[in-house]
Amino acid sequence: MTNIRKSHPLIKIINQSFIDLPAPSNISSWWNFGSLLGICLALQIVTGLFLAMHYTSDTDTAFNSVSHMCRDVNYGWVLRYLHANGASMFFICLYLHVGRGIYYGSYMFKETWNMGVILLFAVMATAFLGYVLPWGQMSFWGATVITNLLSAIPYVGTDLVTWIWGGFAVDKATLTRFFAFHFLFPFIIAALVMVHLLFLHETGSNNPTGIPSNMDMIPFHPYYTIKDILGLFMMILVLLCLVMFSPDLLGDPDNYTPANPLSTPPHIKPEWYFLFAYAILRSIPNKLGGVLALVFSILILFIFPLLHTSKQRSMTFRPFSQCLFWLLVADLLTLTWIGGQPVEQPYIIIGQLASILYFLIIIVMMPLTSLMENHLMKW
């Protein structure tokens, strides 16, 4: 009799994806973040569902409904802070996952990579919508400033902003539709994740050497299930430390003040995970130029396969490319710091230099360095 795991039409799909899946024997802990992202998504959907049961998407009651959750609902504060800090963990895992892909040349799986970049855009959009919902000062002004960027689009910009707002300012209609879309998007993301995995399982995983590993595969279960569970425990430990000891560490104190259209906060800034893009936006004095730089700072990920000039796939054996990669990481950390600072010198010039360096490293320096390494290897 055939094992039901291998014969049942539905269980067979799960078996081929998570149990009997052939995986390279040498993939490191950097390959753990895919499973952690799946768990983050599940956590966000579950906590978000319970939060939605108590939330009201009306400008008069939204702030108070969030306050009521934290004060009067059994363990409501745990749900709220798991959801807020879960988003931070989501982005930490996302950025590490993308960084791993760049370092080890995983972007050469073009379909998987492109799907991943689309997923990154979807998660960023969802996080932005979610940040508006508590209807604090930073929620309101963040929504106003970021949606207003669309007015930089020629001809249709102003009409587009009015259409998104549902009026002539961020108000009840805006909050209601943002809540509707924030609820809907995670399920779309879950569907996109399925497509991402479908493309990945067509080619199999990459590995740290960048060399095809078809000759040396091991089953995903139990080897990598155990490894993923270890990563899961470590992530949960960090998340619970955040939630239990300093739940507001990554948030903004201004969001504990109810939204007031008549009073602008001294420094409008998004959540920490958008600060690098916000710094690039602010570093260009022209509005349309800033918006284009903001969009291209993420869109640039799509052209990584086109910019790959090395004869080797991975950076494991390419020390010069490694130096550039870590320079890029340092540059992104600098941009994140600048995004949280006021618009004054010396922060303005540092932000402008870091923004130029970001695009320069990716578009010019990395491809040229790869060509130089090819020459040094006499390839």
Curated annotation (Swiss-Prot):
GO molecular function, one term: metal ion binding
Superkingdom as given in the UniProt entry: Eukaryota
Alphabetic keyword roster: Electron transport, Heme, Iron, Membrane, Metal-binding, Mitochondrion, Mitochondrion inner membrane, Respiratory chain, Transmembrane, Transmembrane helix, Transport, Ubiquinone
Residues annotated to bind heme b b562: H83, H182
Compartments it resides in: Mitochondrion inner membrane
Residue ranges of the TM segments: 33-53, 77-98, 113-133, 178-198, 226-246, 288-308, 320-340, 347-367
Positions of heme b b566 binding: H97, H196
GO CC annotation terms, alphabetical: mitochondrial inner membrane; respiratory chain complex III
Cofactor(s) for this UniProt protein: heme b
Membrane topology annotation: Multi-pass membrane protein
Residues given in the record as a ubiquinone binding sites: H201
UniProt main location, coarse: mitochondrion
GO biological process: one example: mitochondrial electron transport, ubiquinol to cytochrome c
UniProt key word Ribonucleoprotein: no
Cofactor binding note: Binds 2 heme b groups non-covalently.
Keyword Transferase: no
Subunit organization: The cytochrome bc1 complex contains 11 subunits: 3 respiratory subunits (MT-CYB, CYC1 and UQCRFS1), 2 core proteins (UQCRC1 and UQCRC2) and 6 low-molecular weight proteins (UQCRH/QCR6, UQCRB/QCR7, UQCRQ/QCR8, UQCR10/QCR9, UQCR11/QCR10 and a cleavage product of UQCRFS1). This cytochrome bc1 complex then forms a dimer.
PANTHER family: CYTOCHROME B (PTHR19271:SF16)
Miscellaneous: Heme 1 (or BL or b562) is low-potential and absorbs at about 562 nm, and heme 2 (or BH or b566) is high-potential and absorbs at about 566 nm.
Protein's job: Component of the ubiquinol-cytochrome c reductase complex (complex III or cytochrome b-c1 complex) that is part of the mitochondrial respiratory chain. The b-c1 complex mediates electron transfer from ubiquinol to cytochrome c. Contributes to the generation of a proton gradient across the mitochondrial membrane that is then used for ATP synthesis.
Annotated family: Belongs to the cytochrome b family.
Name of this chain's protein: Cytochrome b
Origin organism lineage: Eukaryota, Metazoa, Chordata, Craniata, Vertebrata
Gene: MT-CYB
